[in-house]
């Protein structure tokens, strides 16, 4: 029989300072034989029943190349969720392998070389776009009505660059959005345009004979006069005709716009020599049009045609937005219009591109201005055309970081750091202070960066980070969509307003933790929350919580039934089926979202849960699952998932407390694969707190992935480990986590891999001189 090293002695074998070959020798001599003997029956390349081929790992270096997989292996062994109960693996071997893998991954994660990784160039997601437009032009744009929903990727967020590509439809939407925004900001004086008879004659060569310039245009039967014109707004317009008939009889006159008949006067009355005005009211869309006049029977003289926009006076808000952009009132034209437009564009581009711009970057938009000027557009319309070009420019729509071609790790430029920071915490462009610090080159200073993190988290705009991060991480942002809050049997306690409150509750909890630097462990066991009077009723606390109005208030739970995210109605409702709680969904949610474990999908041939309960309508969900687990195919995974869900069975499918289910007392007891037993949500939370390291690693990875906008790689584990060490020293503060993410190497620097290097390879952390090119 093999003689195994006691676990403490085995750990000493891989302490820092020991040669790397010791780890490889120990793996080959001690660890691999245990895996081959106890695990290779399922985990092999010939007939695999699991995602890992243990026999493939020949050396310790092979483990380093699959850190995520082996970290999960160690967790499964540590928590006794693997191997199956029937395995012959001894407790000593199980602990030895788990400890060795954990230590080896930890020792090799930080090998003295930094890892920054690289970020895919990505467009602004629709939230970022809307907020940036708001801060750039002062307009709140309903992006949900314009743009399709962004997908999620990476660590599970819509900030991931791999999902933020630009489908063709989105290009059209950007152009539409630019027009909408600028029409709401820029006030163009109402159109008032007139055409003389001579102007109209230019469109009909045959009518020019015998007609003097500036005199009336005589239109004979069948003749048609046309005049092109443009309007600058979707609006109503009046087309006025000043006509003179040539004979005594009445003359019907047909007016067309874009070939469409806009009305005929069947018997107009004109004085023989004087002129009388007739008008048509039409609705026109912004853009070019063609006016046509036809007198099909009798010659008449056209003295002039006038087109006037029927415009309401602009609102005070629109006038203010216009003045903010132009620095002058609508209708006022600067003495040197082109120079003024150039100055306006330079300032606007700097904000839109989130960095200083060069003259060459302004020129293309000045050409748009010139094109508009050549066709006679007013000053406001010329600027509008130029700005619309900016708003569909890739340098506005994408977060561009200029790559350094030399292999290695390179500091980001100050304006790139400012942009990363502002979109991380505010989902918008940098404000004046961040931009000023970037101009001064001060964002390379970690003390300055840390101060900016505090300033930005104290700003109300940080609510958008709390809302987005929590809603997407916990999966609560869709509450109210899946369970429609208009069902008659729910209206007493569940309405659209209650659904909105339930979505907001975890956001306020997390935002409060950020504001007060509360421990991250509050997410597991906080004895406080934020409630409205509607939620007091929803949670059935009317007799225990008083004085709460329609606005959210910080409230301490009156008992310990609820605590942290485990007691939030939004979480509990989103992890249930319709009118049926689900220990499976809830257990899997805790494992994946809270502890960061990978829960495998059910096998394709697994029988549906409903089949186990067929013919047994009086069974509780627990009894149904017990019948389901009788199938060996289902037992392994459910042994890991179900106990956690059972601990939450006192909460019904909407997250309200219950003591009975189908007339039977709720059984909320469970036993984890590790052997820990609990009964009810209070004891379940205590079990979860014992696994705080797994939780803290998971939330650190989630925040880092959200901030970077990419999937984490093996090389990022050193950063994660360093952040966790700092968290431990600072009582696991939520604000501390944000600060350490911002100060981390991957956030402040970027990595250029050698052309032949694999994505996860480590590149020498050579620092190059900072490139200050804007």
Which residue stretches match the model-derived regions?
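Short beta-strand-plus-loop segments that form exposed binding edges in beta-rich domains
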Residues: 292-300
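Extended surface/linker regions that mediate inter-domain or inter-protein docking
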Residues: 100, 120, 128, 132, ...
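Sequence context surrounding c-type heme c attachment/ligation sites in exported
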Residues: 17-72, 79-91, 536, 551-690, ...
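A short tyrosine-centered beta-strand micro-motif
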Residues: 237, 289-291
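Sec-dependent signal peptide recognition
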Residues: 2-9
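Extracellular carbohydrate recognition and processing domains
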Residues: 257-288
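Long, ordered, helix-rich scaffold segments
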Residues: 335, 341, 363, 379, ...
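Aromatic- and Gly/Pro-enriched helix-to-coil junctions and flexible linker segments
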Residues: 10-197, 297-298, 308-326, 350-358, ...
């Amino acid at each position: 029989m093999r003689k195994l090293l006691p676990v403490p002695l085995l750990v000493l074998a891989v302490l820092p300072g020991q040669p790397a070959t010791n780890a490889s020798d120990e793996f080959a001599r001690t660890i691999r034989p245990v895996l081959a003997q106890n695990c290779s029956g399922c985990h092999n390349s010939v007939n695999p029943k699991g995602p890992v081929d243990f026999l493939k790992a020949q050396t310790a270096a092979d483990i380093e190349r699959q850190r995520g997989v082996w970290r999960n292996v160690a967790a499964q062994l540590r928590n006794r969720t693997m191997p199956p109960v029937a395995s012959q693996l001894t407790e000593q071997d199980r602990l030895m392998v788990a400890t060795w893998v954990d230590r080896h991954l930890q020792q090799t994660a930080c090998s003295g070389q930094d890892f920054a990784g690289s970020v895919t160039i990505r467009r602004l997601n629709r939230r970022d776009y809307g907020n940036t437009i708001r801060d750039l032009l002062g307009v709140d744009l309903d992006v949900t009505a314009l743009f399709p929903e962004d997908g999620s990727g990476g660590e599970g967020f819509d900030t991931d660059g791999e999902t933020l590509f630009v489908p063709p439809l989105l290009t059209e939407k950007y152009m539409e959005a630019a027009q909408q925004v600028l029409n709401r900001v820029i006030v163009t004086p109402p159109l008032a345009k007139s055409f003389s008879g001579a102007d109209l004659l230019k469109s009909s060569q045959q009518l020019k004979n015998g007609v003097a310039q500036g005199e009336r245009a005589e239109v004979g039967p069948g003749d048609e006069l046309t005049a092109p014109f443009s309007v600058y707004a979707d609006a109503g317009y009046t087309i006025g005709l000043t006509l003179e008939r040539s004979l005594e009889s009445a003359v019907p006159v047909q007016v067309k716009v874009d070939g469409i008949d806009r009305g005929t006067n069947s018997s107009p009355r004109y004085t023989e020599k004087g002129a009388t005005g007739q008008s048509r009211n039409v609705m026109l869309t912004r853009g070019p049009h063609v006016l046509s006049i036809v007198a099909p029977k009798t010659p008449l003289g056209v003295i002039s045609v006038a087109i006037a926009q029927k415009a309401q006076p602009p609102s005070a808000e629109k006038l203010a937005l216009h003045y903010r952009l132009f620095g002058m009132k609508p209708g006022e034209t600067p003495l040197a219009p082109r120079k003024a437009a150039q100055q306006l564009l330079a300032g606007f581009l700097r904000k839109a591109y989130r960095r200083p711009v060069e003259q060459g970057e302004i020129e293309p938009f000045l050409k748009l201005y010139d094109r508009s000027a050549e066709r006679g557009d007013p000053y406001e319309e010329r600027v509008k055309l130029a700005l619309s070009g900016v708003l569909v420019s890739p340098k506005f729509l994408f977060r561009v970081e200029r790559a350094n071609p030399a292999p290695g790790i390179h500091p980001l430029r100050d304006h790139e750091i400012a942009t990363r920071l502002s979109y991380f915490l505010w989902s918008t462009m940098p404000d004046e202070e961040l931009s000023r610090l970037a101009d001064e080159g001060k964002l390379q200073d970690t003390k300055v960066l840390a101060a900016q993190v505090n300033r930005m988290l104290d700003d109300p705009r940080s609510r958008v980070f709390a809302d987005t991060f929590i809603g997407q991480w916990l999966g609560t942002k869709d509450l109210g969509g899946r369970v429609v809050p208009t069902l008659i049997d729910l209206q007493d306690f569940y309405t659209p307003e209650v659904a909105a409150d339930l979505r907001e509750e975890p956001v306020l909890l997390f935002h409060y933790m950020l504001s007060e630097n509360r421990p991250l462990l509050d997410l597991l066991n906080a004895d406080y929350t934020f409630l409205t009077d509607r939620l007091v009723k929803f949670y059935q606390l009317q007799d225990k919580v008083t004085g709460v109005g329609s606005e959210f208030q910080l409230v301490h739970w009156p008992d310990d039934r609820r605590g942290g995210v485990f007691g939030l109605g939004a979480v509990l409702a989103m992890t249930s089926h319709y009118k049926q709680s689900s220990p499976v969904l809830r257990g899997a949610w805790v494992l994946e979202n809270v502890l960061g474990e990978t829960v495998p999908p059910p096998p394709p041939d697994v029988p549906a849960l409903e089949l186990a309960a067929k013919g047994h309508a009086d069974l509780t969900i627990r009894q149904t699952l017990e019948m389901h687990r009788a199938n060996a195919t289902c037992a392994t995974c459910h042994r890991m998932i179900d106990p956690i869900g059972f601990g939450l069975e006192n909460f019904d499918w909407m997250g309200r407390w219950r003591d009975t289910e189908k007339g039977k007392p709720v059984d909320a007891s469970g036993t984890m694969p590790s052997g820990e037993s609990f009964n009810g949500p209070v004891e379940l939370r205590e079990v979860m707190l014992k696994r705080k390291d797994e939780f803290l690693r998971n939330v650190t990875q989630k925040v880092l992935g959200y901030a970077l906008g990419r999937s984490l790689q093996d090389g990022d584990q050193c950063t994660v480990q360093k952040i966790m060490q700092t968290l431990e020293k600072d009582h696991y503060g939520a604000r501390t986590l944000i600060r350490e993410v911002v100060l981390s190497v991957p956030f402040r620097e970027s990595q250029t891999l050698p052309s032949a290097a694999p994505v996860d390879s480590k590149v020498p952390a050579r620092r190059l001189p900072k490139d200050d090119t804007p």
